[in-house]
């Protein structure tokens, strides 16, 4: 890369993608139990009580899929960078807590939020992910050194003491109906002790940022984002049908200007739809997933089917086995690129999760002037 060049620029989820970070599966661990994580792991999950490194064969398979995905992007003229994995199978600590393991660096979308010429490191809300930003520092340093306009920012690191989490969430006896009621009432595992947010709870629509209030992002985190992005309008949204609301990109996915697919089990509430509808945007139900269950040892739901990566307003990457989602996007006029990734889902998510924007063509626009 040449010094003085504009390297970092991305204002939305659909402008032509030219430079991206794709995660790695090396050394990924199933994290040890901790307050935020216990609430996220479904009560009947085969991950309850397990922690430590994932098996070499599953890591190798996931890495092969991530490498293949990277090669698909490179062949389409997109520059791909990769993170530097840490030894995730080691104990970490701060003066407030200890964690038996870390997590991994397969999903950079969770950690890095690119808005214009700035890349922001999110606070994160899991103790096991507190040090994950280090995997991306070599890349961010390179961008900063070469791009005179690049801003590298980091949100205040949270203490993540027990005061950040509700103990009520830890019981195995809580049924799905009670969880859904809690979600409807916006009663989540995280308290309002300090600002918390994951980057994957934020969607970028030019001058507007749409942020999910849920397990991994609290209202103080959303307020911090409002203060930080002074030239943007920041909107809090929530999805009452999701008993485990974490990250917005398997629930609400912009495909191109004017069009969003929404998880039919987690519809955006009527009042919150006005921002989009008043400005001529269409919100349609996403197609059903092709699978009835997520892969083994996976945190995510079957709705990773809609966790797609838009390469430009006419082109989208969809997981190869998700035939219904591919068919829907094809009918909507998109060129669909099938990408095999299902065997890497357990390492941190789908095609959107495992990437983070560095550069998309385009400038800052106002897509919602009527507010």
Where are these predicted regions, by residue range?
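The feature marks the mature, well-folded catalytic cores of soluble enzymes
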Residues: 1-371
């Amino acid at each position: 890369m040449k010094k003085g060049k504009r390297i970092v620029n991305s204002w939305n989820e659909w402008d032509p993608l030219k430079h991206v970070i794709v995660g790695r599966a090396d050394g990924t661990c199933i994290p040890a139990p901790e307050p935020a994580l216990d609430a996220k792991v479904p009560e009947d999950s085969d991950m309850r009580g397990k922690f430590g490194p994932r098996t070499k064969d599953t890591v190798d398979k996931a890495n092969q899929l991530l490498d293949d995905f990277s090669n698909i992007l490179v062949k389409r003229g997109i520059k791909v960078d990769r993170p530097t994995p840490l030894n995730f199978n080691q104990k970490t600590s701060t003066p407030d807590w200890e964690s038996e393991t870390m997590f991994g660096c397969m999903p950079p979308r969770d950690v890095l939020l690119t808005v214009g010429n700035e890349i922001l490191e999110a606070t994160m809300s899991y103790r096991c992910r507190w040090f994950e930003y280090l995997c991306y520092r070599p890349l961010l340093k390179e961008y900063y050194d070469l791009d005179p306009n690049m801003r590298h920012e980091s949100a205040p690191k949270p203490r993540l003491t027990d005061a950040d989490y509700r103990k009520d969430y830890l019981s195995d006896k809580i049924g799905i109906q009670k969880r859904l009621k809690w979600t409807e009432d916006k009663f989540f595992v995280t308290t309002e002790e300090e600002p918390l947010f994951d980057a994957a709870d934020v969607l970028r629509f030019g001058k507007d940022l749409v942020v999910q209030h849920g397990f991994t992002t609290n209202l103080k985190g959303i307020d911090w984002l409002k203060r930080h992005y002074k030239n943007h309008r920041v909107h809090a949204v929530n999805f009452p049908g999701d008993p485990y609301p974490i990250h917005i990109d398997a629930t609400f996915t912009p495909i191109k200007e004017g069009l969003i697919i929404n998880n039919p089990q987690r519809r955006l509430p009527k009042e919150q739809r006005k921002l989009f509808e008043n400005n001529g945007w269409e919100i349609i139900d996403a197609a059903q997933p092709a699978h009835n269950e997520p892969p083994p040892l996976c945190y995510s739901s079957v709705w990773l089917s809609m966790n797609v990566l838009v390469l430009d307003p006419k082109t989208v990457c969809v997981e190869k086995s998700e035939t219904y989602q591919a068919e829907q996007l094809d009918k909507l006029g998109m060129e669909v690129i099938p990408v095999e990734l299902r065997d890497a889902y357990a390492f941190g998510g789908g095609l959107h999760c495992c990437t983070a924007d560095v550069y998309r063509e385009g400038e800052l626009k106002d897509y919602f002037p009527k507010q």
